[in-house]
Amino acid sequence: LPGFSVTPIHTVGGVRTNVTFYENVRVPAAMIFGELNGGWRLITEQLNHERVGLAALAYGAMGCFDQTVEWARTTPAAEGGRVIDRPWAQLALAEAYVVLQANAVLGNRVAWEISRESVRPELASACKVFGTESYIKVLQLLLDVVGCAGLVKQGSPGARLQGRLEREWRMCQINTFGGGAVEVLRDMVATMGLGQPRGR
């Protein structure tokens, strides 16, 4: 369309997003999606689903968790025995497991709500904040267990777990921005979910 332009942004996570610009764009009537002037309602509903989808990406950390547990079971610790036998490793893995399970419960709750009706914005926002921050927390814990070599890229000498933790670590950082920054979404949870006054 005339007046529409796109500028790509290549992220540290290895994916591309875009900034879009609209200047005097005229949309032909045949291309209108939904009702005229109903775009805000449409986009906010879509954003709720995007937020839930971003939270669901934290399920990818379950595979990282399983790989890390297996690695810890089969890798000798510097202090003797296996990494999995070290109390610090057990505590980190236990905490990661608890966070993953809590995220799964919240994700299932939101999926149930979506199956019954549209998801409420405050619940989608809470799910996104918890899910994306859980993803970061779990990967931090797994990197504590695996050590610095967990941050070595796939294909590089010394990469552990085929570089999966490094790859996921880069991706999980940018997920906190998609669908709205977590700081903004916390305000939405407070105002829409808890009836608190606006923070700003």
Model regions: which residues?
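Glycine-rich phosphate/cofactor-binding loops in nucleotide/flavin-utilizing enzymes
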Residues: W40-A55, V146-R200
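FAD-binding core of flavoproteins
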Residues: L1-E70, T191-R200
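C-terminal helix-coil-helix/basic helical segment that borders enzyme active sites and/or dimer interfaces
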Residues: R73, A77-P87, Q101-P157
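Tryptophan-centric aromatic hotspots in well-structured domains and transmembrane helices
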Residues: T20-F21, W40-R41, W71, V105-N108, ...
